[in-house]
Amino acid sequence: MIGGLFIYNHKGEVLISRVYRDDIGRNAVDAFRVNVIHARQQVRSPVTNIARTSFFHVKRSNIWLAAVTKQNVNAAMVFEFLYKMCDVMTAYFGKISEENIKNNFVLIYELLDEILDFGYPQNSETGALKTFITQQGIKSQHLTKEEQSQITSQVTGQIGWRREGIKYRRNELFLDVLESVNLLMSPQGQVLSAHVSGRVVMKSYLSGMPECKFGMNDKIVIDKQGKGGTTDDTGKSGKQSIAIDDCTFHQCVRLSKFDSERSISFIPPDGEYELMRYRTTKDIILPFRVIPLVREVGRTKLEVKVVIKSNFKPSLLAQKIEVRIPTPLNTSGVQVICMKGKAKYKASENAIVWKIKRMVGMKESQISAEIELLPTNDKKKWARPPISMNFEVPFAPSGLKVRYLKVFEPKLNYSDHDVIKWVRYIGRSGIYETRC
């Protein structure tokens, strides 16, 4: 159970305060401000224990959300509530900022009254909350008895994430497979660590209470132990199987069918939601290979050559490519020659930034630079920070594929063929580094 919830600004001033237990006093507010927000050293742990009181906290921009308790609670449950609270506030009034919180403080208190009951999370589904809590306040005073009973059955029923009676002139379903690939590679091209974090995000604008079925690769292996590490950089993203280390689903998914059929069956919420989140470390398709060559010419000059190779199908096009090549602190000047794109030395960042708008698969490009160094008495050698890379590719580096996406709605008499469906793959770089 949660004893209290506090929302602070970057100065440590309390914007929202709700206490659910008598054992949480004003001293808890001050303790968090002094020991976390105003701490001399940055607090890295998301859980802070002060005088037998536990503070679970997350930060959004310059806003802190802290759940406080003196009990031995389930930490995962508390963080799930905090992240859900952030999602709900974003859905209601956009960006979480001090100004937006002050302008919507009445709304936030109304939401807390519905989401938390005596410190226990109850209902955090945005779709259900929006049926009776609006930007203008609670709607229940103007609802008929039939509408009130409909809300009650939605919140307390088996399908609390979707209300009945939804109608659209055109039934549409959008599915995005969003992945972030992280890599650390040695100068010789050996993969030291690699993993992909992925999300399946859907936007459903469907009438009635449809049943959706979503199928992925023919074989999906859930490896709870996560012993992965091998990678595949052949550039072929047509894998028939995928090994997932761990995954979580939206509450609408029927897990029994996923275990037996490896298909996801669900009644979707209305609007945008995250259907699935997963992580994999096996058989990753590395979109780019970075080949660095650094040569020291005496003590006042460096010659750097970097080649990037795209390891995916020639029919695909990568975008927003950026390579950051670090330079020593005593750099006095840089001369750059690049075959493609634009490159510029940024002295304030101690790096050469090379940008390429687009690049097709199975191609390579290179950049050469001569770096002039100022004489220095420092005998310590340059540490050679890794070369980092940013990009966006139109495929899933994990190899995840959507085999089918079907919709059934027997009551309203529309079939799968009447639904307009869109599937999109977006792979982005996370921390994508190559040592030099």
Curated annotation (Swiss-Prot):
Keywords: Cell membrane, Coated pit, Endocytosis, Lipid-binding, Membrane, Protein transport, Transport. One of its GO terms (molecular function) is lipid binding. Pfam families: Adap_comp_sub, Clat_adaptor_s. One of its GO terms (biological process) is clathrin-dependent endocytosis. A 1,2-diacyl-sn-glycero-3-phospho-(1D-myo-inositol-3,4,5-trisphosphate) binds at K342, K346, K355. It is a peripheral membrane protein. The keyword Transport applies. InterPro entries: Adaptor_comp_med_subunit, AP2_Mu_C_sf, AP2_Mu_N, AP_mu_sigma_su, Clathrin_mu, Clathrin_mu_CS, Longin-like_dom_sf, MHD. GO terms for cellular component: AP-2 adaptor complex; cytoplasmic vesicle. Residues 170-435 form the MHD domain. It comes from the Eukaryota. Its main location: membrane. It is found in: Cell membrane; Membrane, Coated pit. Adaptor protein complex 2 (AP-2) is a heterotetramer composed of two large adaptins (alpha-type subunit and beta-type subunit), a medium adaptin (mu-type subunit) and a small adaptin (sigma-type subunit). Belongs to the adaptor complexes medium subunit family. Component of the adaptor complexes which link clathrin to receptors in coated vesicles. Clathrin-associated protein complexes are believed to interact with the cytoplasmic tails of membrane proteins, leading to their selection and concentration. AP50 is a subunit of the plasma membrane adaptor. The complex binds polyphosphoinositide-containing lipids. This is AP-2 complex subunit mu-B. It comes from Danio rerio (Zebrafish). The lineage of its organism: Eukaryota, Metazoa, Chordata, Craniata, Vertebrata.
